[in-house]
């Protein structure tokens, strides 16, 4: 039998060393990947508990296994809190990820070969919005809209023109690298004009939506998905939301289980419930407001130092920096900043001359540094360091200096304080 005192130390030191090294990296590096954040110890406590052991195929009150009376309560808590947080009538907390939530939406509401209209990956969309390499681009006839290259903003006239031309069954609104506010009423009007469903993927901005600092898509969309990490600061997982519609609710439930998944991850659902409770607290709005202020402060520095911020600035938690003018690649910038313990990700920019493996841009987000306690002053200083490195990318002395400054910041702003 197992002992309550079993631990990794002394049993699997090789694995433990890698895990400890990652913990140290998170403390010693500044995290600017827009899709990453730090979960609270409460969230991790819930995810690391005994619910890991429980199989619970089905939904609360309608399980295919016995012994589910307690996990039913856990899942109902998560559902009720998600509905309250976003003002939704329906919530499904079982998707294992944002991508699996999106796949379930397609499975529920589309047939193979149906036309979908989504944002191009090259212009800031997501793989699951119809990219050719994704199942969403292989199973469905995916048409892509993008940005007006003159303004860096979504070209809603193009969206409408493509919708009228291709008559999609579904229009997808959402992004992975767009720094401005989506016009949900305009998307709804376009969808209604051509008789399409409107599906919103708000994975990146869900925390801002929950705080009332970004428009809520629930009143406009037929279905909404999100991840539960990123700006929500929860565990890695997915969530589907909708207004009351019995037909759509039944289709969505069936698409998640048994259509796309088997047993739900009850320990992750418990962690989602904690995350939603944290997001319902008054302080969560203060956090999200600081996320936006920090992003705006960084964008101002980049623009002031001569870097092109796609779309001209940011309304949310992220920004996309084009390095075309500087003659740099995203890959080189990613590596140089990483050597200075600043973590970003290379990212394609509109009309990128480089391949997706090289790119001409970097994406930067402020959720994680804001969780650490950074405010505008720290973020302006940080943006300046990034510019220092990119301005003199082949000078190792600059990188070494910045790495020392990063270390001071990280010691002053620990991820998990004592």
UniProtKB/Swiss-Prot annotation:
Its main location: cytoplasm. Pathway: One-carbon metabolism; tetrahydrofolate interconversion; Amino-acid biosynthesis; glycine biosynthesis; glycine from L-serine: step 1/1. It comes from the Bacteria. The record marks 229 as: Plays an important role in substrate specificity. The keyword ATP-binding does not apply. (6S)-5,6,7,8-tetrahydrofolate binds at residues 121, 125-127, 355-357. Pfam families: SHMT. The modification N6-(pyridoxal phosphate)lysine is found at residue 230. It catalyses: (6R)-5,10-methylene-5,6,7,8-tetrahydrofolate + glycine + H2O = (6S)-5,6,7,8-tetrahydrofolate + L-serine. Its cofactor is pyridoxal 5'-phosphate. Homodimer. PANTHER family: SERINE HYDROXYMETHYLTRANSFERASE. This is Serine hydroxymethyltransferase 2. The gene is glyA2.
């Amino acid at each position: 039998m197992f002992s309550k005192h079993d631990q990794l130390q002394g049993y699997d030191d090789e694995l433990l060393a890698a895990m400890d090294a990652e913990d140290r990296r998170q403390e010693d590096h500044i995290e600017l990947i827009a899709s990453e954040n730090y979960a609270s110890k409460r969230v991790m406590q819930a995810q690391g508990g005994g619910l890991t052991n429980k199989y619970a195929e089905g939904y609360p009150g309608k399980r295919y296994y016995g012994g589910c009376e307690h996990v039913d309560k856990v899942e109902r808590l998560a559902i009720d809190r998600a509905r309250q947080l976003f003002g939704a009538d329906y919530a499904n907390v079982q998707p294992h990820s944002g991508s699996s939530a999106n796949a379930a939406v397609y499975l529920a509401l589309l047939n193979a070969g149906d036309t979908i209209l989504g944002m191009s990956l090259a212009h800031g969309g997501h793989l699951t919005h119809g990219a050719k390499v994704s199942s969403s681009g292989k199973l469905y006839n995916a048409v892509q809209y993008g940005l007006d290259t003159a303004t860096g903003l979504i070209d809603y006239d193009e969206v409408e023109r493509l919708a009228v031309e291709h008559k999609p069954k579904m229009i997808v609104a959402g992004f992975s690298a767009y720094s401005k506010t989506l016009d949900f009423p305009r998307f709804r009007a376009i969808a209604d004009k051509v008789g399409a469903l409107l599906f919103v993927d708000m994975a990146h901005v869900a925390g801002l939506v929950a705080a009332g600092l970004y428009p809520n898509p629930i009143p406009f969309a037929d279905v909404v998905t999100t991840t539960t990490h990123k700006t929500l600061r929860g565990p890695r997982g997915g969530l589907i939301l909708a207004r009351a519609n019995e037909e759509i609710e039944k289709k969505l439930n069936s698409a998640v289980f048994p259509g796309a998944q088997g047993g739900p991850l009850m320990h992750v659902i418990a962690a989602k419930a904690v995350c939603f409770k944290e997001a319902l607290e008054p302080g969560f709005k203060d956090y999200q407001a600081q996320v936006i202020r920090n992003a705006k402060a960084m964008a101002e520095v980049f623009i002031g130092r001569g870097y092109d911020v796609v779309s001209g600035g940011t309304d949310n938690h992220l920004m996309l920096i084009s390095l075309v003018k500087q003659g740099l690649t995203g890959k080189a910038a990613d590596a140089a900043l990483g050597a200075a313990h600043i973590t970003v990700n290379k990212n394609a920019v509109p009309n990128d001359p480089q391949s997706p493996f090289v790119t001409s841009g970097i994406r930067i987000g402020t959720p994680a540094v804001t969780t650490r306690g950074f405010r505008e002053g720290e973020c302006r200083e940080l943006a300046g360091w990034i510019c220092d490195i990119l301005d003199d990318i082949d000078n190792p002395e600059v990188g070494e200096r910045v790495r020392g400054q990063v270390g001071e910041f990280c010691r002053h702003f620990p991820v998990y304080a004592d």
